[in-house]
Amino acid sequence: MSNSTMEATQMKVKLAVDEMIDDLDKTYLRDMQKSMFQCSARCCDNKKTTRDAVENCVESCNDGMKKAQGYLEKELGGLQDQLSRCAMTCYDKLVQQFGPDVNKYSESQKLSFNEKLDSCVSVCADDHIKLIPAIKKRFAKNT
C-alpha cells in the first residue's frame, strides 16, 4: 500500500472514530464524569468516617465511568481487530492472485498489487466506518 494512500485511509478511520468519541463524550461521558466527581465529593463530606471508608466510597463512585470506558475500549479494540483482519484478507487474496513471492513480481505487478491493495483496504475502512453508529447505540444501551 502506498504511504500516502495508507495514511489517508488511516486518517479517515481515525477522524470517524474521534468524531464518535467526541459525540459520546458530549452525550454521555461528561455527565457520567460530573456525577462521579459529585459523588466523590459527597464521600468526603462526613468528617467522622475512616479514610478507608472514604476511599471505598470514591472507588464506588468511579465504577460507572470505569465500566463505560472499559466498554468503549472493548468496542474500539474489536473494531481495530476486524479492520486489521479485513486488511490481511485483502493482502492474502492478492498474494493468491499474484503469487506468494512478492520479490519476484515485475514492476507492473507490484504497481497493480499495490493499487488493488489500496483499493481493497479503503473499502475495508469504509465498511468499518459504517459500523460506528451501531457501536454508539450499543454504548448508549450498555452505559
Curated annotation (Swiss-Prot):
Keyword Cytoplasm: yes
Record-level GO cellular component terms: cytoplasm; striated muscle dense body
Keywords: Cytoplasm
Subcellular location: Cytoplasm
Family per record: Belongs to the FAM136 family.
Physiological role: May play a role in locomotion and behavior.
Protein name, UniProt field: FAM161 homolog famh-136
Chain's gene name: famh-136
